[in-house]
Amino acid sequence: PGQIEKSAVNLVAFAKTAVLEPEQSQELTLTFDLYDMASYDSYDMNKNGASTYELDKGKYSIKVMNNAHELNECENAEIEFEIASNLNYKLDPKTKQIVKNRFTGDTAYAGVPIDGSTAGSKIEYLSRGNFGETFPVDATPNRSGAEVSKANSYVYNGYENNERYTTAPKQGQNYGDEHLRLWTRADGSPATTSDLQGTGGVELKLNEELVEKLGRNYKAPEWEQLLNEITEAELYYLVECSGYSNAEMVSIGKAKNYDYDGPSGLQANAGTPDGVDKGKWTGFGGQMNLAQTFNIELAFSMGRTIGNEAQATGISGWYAPGVNLHRTPYNGRYFEYYSEDTVLSGWLGAYVIKGSLSANVYCYLKHFALSEMGQNPTRLNVWVTEQALRETYLRPFEIAVKEGGANGVMTAFNRIGGTW
């Protein structure tokens, strides 16, 4: 009572030895931050006026374990320490951004809390503090068709006085002689649509100086100008017509790139460049097989191998890895995801991404977020507390972005709470 609800055991770090012969040993170093042990207090359960990542005061144990239940037999396998007063993370230790509730209460995104507190009926969440009273016994009956139709027709009207949503940026701006282009023809003239699609039969030249500036600093002024130059029609086309590719943009000299599925290796679907021999792509086992190895070096090798195959066959982006969690046996996409553990999933995904990026192939981390319910769960409302969202379902994505350098994300089909 008076503290944030938390599990008894959490994985914070893991490592794997080489193959050891009898009498051989190996020293392993495990590192983590106190932030990795923190709980998210979405409802201010410890009454300190903060809703952020926190460590409650009290005793903690760091254990070297073989699994979630079995302590390792090594020396000093358990170390206890005490935190004298609550530790709050007002800023994210890596990004330095403010940490606060974004999906709970009156300040929730789009005005719709994801915990269902404004949905008109109480949602009882399972609690470790009271399994008997909170464990569901009877299935919740389906709502009537009229109720579902009413819910589906809901429109959020809170955008009217928000400049962020009501003022569209001016697109298609022309900067004359200072106009920025990623690719031009070899003579410096603007590339055409067919040129950027690779069918124009002309040699193109990359603006290496511009690309280096853009890649070095996301706050570079060149980014603002480049985005201003893109036409509105090109933006729509990029969003609406980019399955297994991302479209060319004549306004900025962006070439068409091909992107491909999936987490177990490039899949032989339609849409690859002409002349690609898909039969030479490698099919890997399900991702839970990789997870069972606890081997981040192997994850890196897998990512690099697929990245090399992609580069050799004209593929620039990869729809992978998938870091959704195993929550039920009845999901036909679990071969694409690693495990039920957030930290294991996040770190394996991070190293797969590192491997792919080392071969100059970018990744689309997926499926963001809460897509644990099956085959592309469309029109599904997933109700969850912000604590569970952050600690469980978003954590693998957080690790993969912060530690793996993911620079692409594939969104899910479901709603989070009542918001899509």
Region spans (language model):
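Glycoside hydrolase catalytic-domain context in secreted enzymes
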Residues: 1-49, 53-64, 68-70, 105-106, ...
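Short beta-strand elements
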Residues: 70-100
